[in-house]
Amino acid sequence: MRRRESRGAKGGGFLTPPPSWHTTRRVYIAMPISERKRSPLIENQESFRVRTGDSPYVRAKHAQLVSKDPNRAISLFWAAINAGDRVDSALKDMVVVLKQLNRFDEGIEAIKSFRYLCPFESQDSIDNLLLELYMKSGRITEVAELLEHKLRTLEQDKHYGGRIKIAKRSHEEQNNKTIEQEKARILGNLAWVHLQLHNYGIAEQYYRNALSLEPDNNKLCNLAICLIRMERTHEAKSLLEDVKQSLGNQWKNEPFCKSFERATEMLAEREQATVADKPEDLLTSSFSDNFSSRCSGGMKGKKALAGTSTELGNIHKTNSHASSESVEQNSPGLTTQPRECKWVDEEVDQSKWDATIGASRKLRFWTVGPVRSLRFGNDYQKNLKSVGTAASTTNDELHQFISSDADCMTSKARKLCPELIKDKEDNEKESERIASESSSAYAKITDIGQRKVLHIDQRKVRHIGQRSV
């Protein structure tokens, strides 16, 4: 091994290079946990941690986790609470065991009875347990009241200084949440509760307040469900489309996928229901086309009516194979509406009546012109004057119904309204009967009156004769 010739030279020492094992670094590959050798102590150790000692709480935890005896664990937890040994932990663990046994009412009563013994820091976790018990037992109203109480205390309490620390017992770690995040969580839960209570307006307000504090796709999907319940499908559809566009095809892997699928199913069902209730909405375009074609057909019919009567006959023949709707559309006016029928001597207006002869059988016809006297109306008017007030109303209505243009009514028009003529004849007979009855009654009354007058006169004459004698 060579040494430097001059020991006093700078950087004295050996001139040989350092060995290779100093420069190369060894790389250790970590073995999987399943392939590692385990010591006998680790193999015999349980997967959970059990506290050591002989206190009531430790014995209760041992019965819960090791012995797997929930009933004995509940009795030991009661003993720990009465002894004052870790009251908050014993109470919460006992409520968890009661919840596993579906004894929800007992857990609720235990929390209400002993939560005052627990410190302030554990009240929030106790409230969460109480909410779970209320939900399991179906007491939704109590859930809403408790959430509103938590919301009020969160807004009023300034103890946290802007941040809230919530410890997870299972992992023994802490998650920091701001007051706004915790408030948004409570508002979302409160909105869901009101959604179950069918208070959709209140639920919408809580959801929108929660989304203003913290955006959340799960709350957006629940808000869409709330809007669907309120028959506001367009807003719900836009919300769901925004959620789907923001995530693309990755929404199936998100935790809110069930809410999104539920909202989509409800929206599809509601749209199908609206289509079933109003099928004409889907046929708007075809209906408009048919309407325009029918309107053009109606204009053609009007032009044909302006011609001769032979053209009208041809139109009526061409429409003989069509449905009643097409015939009505080609008619001069809609037969479902009352209209004026001016009876004049022109052939065109008379031909209009001939064209619509089959569709206007029971319509009332009247005119605005001057009132004319009926050919058969002289006796009828005399009878009307002699009839009392009981029959005058119906006869006046009939007289207005058969208007002043009845002089020009042809035999063809009389055939069209046989029911009206029959009613008129019945009314005439009734008026004659009433008139005859009233006249006979008047005659009887006058006869009786005359007899009474004669009888009184005879008595007066007799009395005067007796006095004179």
From Swiss-Prot:
GO terms for biological process: cell division. PROSITE patterns: TPR, TPR_REGION. It comes from Arabidopsis thaliana (Mouse-ear cress). This is Protein POLLENLESS 3-LIKE 1. Belongs to the MS5 protein family. Residues 314-338 have a biased composition (Polar residues). GO terms for cellular component: nucleus. It holds the Pfam family TPR_2.
